[in-house]
Structure formats: structure tokens, C-alpha cells
Amino acid sequence: MIKNRKKKSYTSVYALGQYISMSAHKARRVIDQIRGRSYEEALMILELMPYRGCYPIFKLVYSAAANASHNKGFKETNLVISKAEVNQGNTVKKLKPRARGRSFPIKRSTCHITIVVEDISFYQQYEEYLRYLKNPGCSNENRNLTCYDTYSSGGPWDKK
């Protein structure tokens, strides 16, 4: 059996909540609203949504940001929720006593929630570095030249 090993990422941090007493379907309804949003925007959305599942997800997003700032020194203003997934957990089965000595089964579903946040400031610096590598001597003023501008600028091809 071949296992895919996770590559070590220098820009992402995660928080994992296991055995949260909520159905996976109800948690996904909340998670879909915050996926891809910035950290501050996600906290505002979670505070204002009227669902019971918002509070554990709010705590996980807050924990992921705390992990990012403490463990890797990221700023919270640059964090974006890059990945948020909900997996189904165990089902806790109980018996509810009823009348005349009978009992009814109760199934309590749980879920596992993973929140991954990334620091986007590294991507912006990386894009600037790639632009510099493509045109190291070219400044911003020379990038908007057309073919006609290069030939009619008084170079050797402009002479008759």
C-alpha cells in the first residue's frame, strides 16, 4: 500500500477538531460559507450566522490563527482559509429509557473538522520575485512598449 506523504509547507498552518458533537452535514453548511475567505472576514461571518455549529468552527478558526502567529510568526491580517473540510466521525449510540420498561436507541453523530490557513504575503513576494527573474533589467516604465515603439525609437533600424 502506497501512502501519499504530505509535503512540508512553509506558508500553511492547520487546526484539527475531532469528535465534535454535530452532524457532518450541518457543519458543512457553515464551512462552505467561510472557505476561501480571509481570517477576519471568516470570524465576522461566523459571529453573525444563526447556526449552532458556528461556535465550534469559530473556535477552530481562532485556534488555527493562534497556531500560525505563535508557531510560525505570521500576521493575522495576511491569513486566508485555504482549506476547510468536514469528515464524518463516530456515531455514539445510547439507550433512552421509555415507559413500561422499554428503551429507544439514540444515535448521536460526531464529525472531524480541519481548518488550514495560509499566509498570502509570501505569495505576493514570490510573484514579485518571479517578475524580477523574467525581466531583471526592465523597469515598470519599459514594460508597456510595443513593437512599433522599439523600432521607431531612434535605434539602428530607424535609419534610412
UniProtKB/Swiss-Prot annotation:
UniProt-listed Gene3D superfamilies: Ribosomal protein L22/L17
Main localization, broad class: plastid
BP-aspect Gene Ontology terms: translation
Pfam families, per the entry: Ribosomal_L22
One Gene Ontology term, aspect cellular component: large ribosomal subunit
InterPro entries assigned to the protein according to its UniProt record, in alphabetical order: Ribosomal_uL22, Ribosomal_uL22_bac/chlpt-type, Ribosomal_uL22_bac/org-type, Ribosomal_uL22_CS, Ribosomal_uL22_sf
Subcellular location: Plastid, Chloroplast
Alphabetical UniProt keywords: Chloroplast, Plastid, Ribonucleoprotein, Ribosomal protein, RNA-binding, rRNA-binding
CDD domains, alphabetized: Ribosomal_L22
Highest taxon, organism lineage: Eukaryota
Gene Ontology MF terms in the entry: rRNA binding; structural constituent of ribosome
Known function: This protein binds specifically to 23S rRNA. The globular domain of the protein is located near the polypeptide exit tunnel on the outside of the subunit, while an extended beta-hairpin is found that lines the wall of the exit tunnel in the center of the 70S ribosome.
Family listed: Belongs to the universal ribosomal protein uL22 family.
HAMAP family: Ribosomal_uL22_B
Complex and partners: Part of the 50S ribosomal subunit.
The protein's name: Large ribosomal subunit protein uL22c
